[in-house]
Amino acid sequence: MYPWWRLFSRLFAPLRRYKRIIEEDLAPLWQNADVAVKGVNTAFGWTVQGGRITEHELEQIRTGYDGAAGEALRVLVVHHHLAELIALAGHDLARGAEKAFETAQQAGVKLILCGHLHIAHIAPVGLHPGDGIIVATAGTCTSNRGRGKDKAVNHFNLISVEATDLHIEERVYLPEESRFEPVAEHRFER
């Protein structure tokens, strides 16, 4: 996505660099016997904050796991958030987020990976008690775009999928040691 000051590119070719450098397909699927990971685009040149989910993206979520192994952990990857994280109250959500979250639940998604906020946070989130999806927000890994306490702090999440558990380890970069170090661990039943 081009920055707001490159208005023409942002409005008329917002994902040109992404498609050229990373991937043409804006809704890729990667799967094996244990995991099915579906990406859905929430970034559009006409939105300034929060992104959006249209009926087209909802259909990608609904049908994106067709053919996935029955026991495979279903993971949805989006840039913008689909649910508010209590610890980060007041942050932007994608337009159409609630419907997208419901659609993800109906599709059997158990883990949503997202970014946008440049803050590391992992928590189960549900629209109703007992129906939660784990939301893992990644901090910034390769820039200084963090916010608040995460400003200029680099993070990433290491995810391990086991037969009965999902393990997410948050790692933070220690510049004085030139390495990433685990700072928090989360384990969830599948």
Where are the predicted features?
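Short catalytic/ligand-binding loop motif for oxyanion handling, primarily in non-cytosolic enzymes
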Residues: 2-5, 46-48, 83-86, 121-123, ...
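Conserved beta-sheet core of the metallophosphoesterase superfamily
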Residues: 89-163
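A short C-terminal boundary segment appended to hydrolase-like catalytic domains
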Residues: 160-190
